[in-house]
Structures are given as structure tokens and as C-alpha cells.
Amino acid sequence: MINDILHEADGKMDKSVEATREEFAAIRAGRAQPSMFNKITVDYYGTPTPLQQLASFTSPEARIIIISPYDIGAMGNIERAIRDSDLGVNPSNDGKTLRCVFPELTEERRKEYIKVAKAKAEDGRVAVRNLRRTAKQHLEKLEKDGEVGKDDVTGAEKRLDGMTKKHTDAIDDLLKHKESELLEV
């Protein structure tokens, strides 16, 4: 029982760390990356579809991404979705591909992105702490129902605290890495 609760909490905490990593991937650093387009959905014949399913991406230079749609008919919708996103780029359409040129990051913009990264890291830490609280409530319920003893619950809570620290430290490490990436000129 206790191991099941701890195992489930650990798995969910891993997912929270991974979700934070994906959020950080969408934050633009100095180099343009296809992962920046992960959150963009395109209206494809009436169905919201992730952009990765509709096109391939290449990056010939550090600040340029070329998007080649599999279906040329979706070009206008892809262009509109990119323009409406928060990426801050205006794609140029040559009929077969979309070319997105990202401007150099200013110091002010870098600091803005660092604030966004810190907010996303805090969201990740809050998610991990909420998972800890839920798991702790389950453990206390087991003790209250008389299914396990107080010593078992105390030991499990210590293990749970260790898992929580491990996952929040992982999020902090991701944040430090993203900050250094953003400050790199």
C-alpha cells in the first residue's frame, strides 16, 4: 500500500519535472529551435492539430527556421497560427515553405524570458509540492483507517520528502541551465 502511493507520487513528480522541461524548451534562447513551435496548434480542416504533425522543420542558421508543410493547402493556416502565437515572428511565405527569422535577443527581452522561466519553474515546484501533499494525505488516511502503523507512515513521509526535494532540485537545475542559456550572448 505505502509503496504503491510512493511509487505513484514519484511517477507523477517525474512527469511534472518533464512538463517543466518542455515549458523551458518553448522559451527562446539565442538559437532558434523547432521545439519553440511545440505549443502551436493549427486549424487543419476544422480540427486543431499540432504544427509538428503538419510540417517538417529545418534550421539552416542560428536564427532561422524553415517550415515545410506536408500539405500546401494548410500553408495559410500554419502562417496565421505562427503569426498569432507569442513567438514574435512574422513568417515569410514563398509558396512552398515558410521562413521564420528570429530577431537578436535584446538584454531587456532576455530578462523578460528569465522572468517567464522563473514563473514556469515555480509552477513546476508547486505541482510537485501538491503531489507531495496528496500522497501525504493518502498515507495519513491509511494510518487513520488502521491499515498501517505510525512508524511505517513516518518512514514513508521521510521517503516522500526526499523524493520531493529530489524533484524540486531537478527543476531548480533546469532553471539554472535555462538562465545561463538565456544570458549567453
Model-derived features: where do they sit?
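Short, conserved catalytic or interaction motifs in soluble domains
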Residues: A29, L87, K144
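Glycine-rich active-site/cofactor-binding loop and its immediate structural neighborhood
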Residues: A62-S92, K96-L98
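Short, electropositive, low-hydrophobicity segments enriched in small/polar residues
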Residues: P34, P50, S92, R99, ...
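Short, intrinsically disordered, mixed-charge
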Residues: E22, R80-G88, A119-E122, R133
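Positively charged, low-complexity, intrinsically disordered RNA-binding extensions
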Residues: L98-V185
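A positional/architectural concept
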Residues: M1-G76
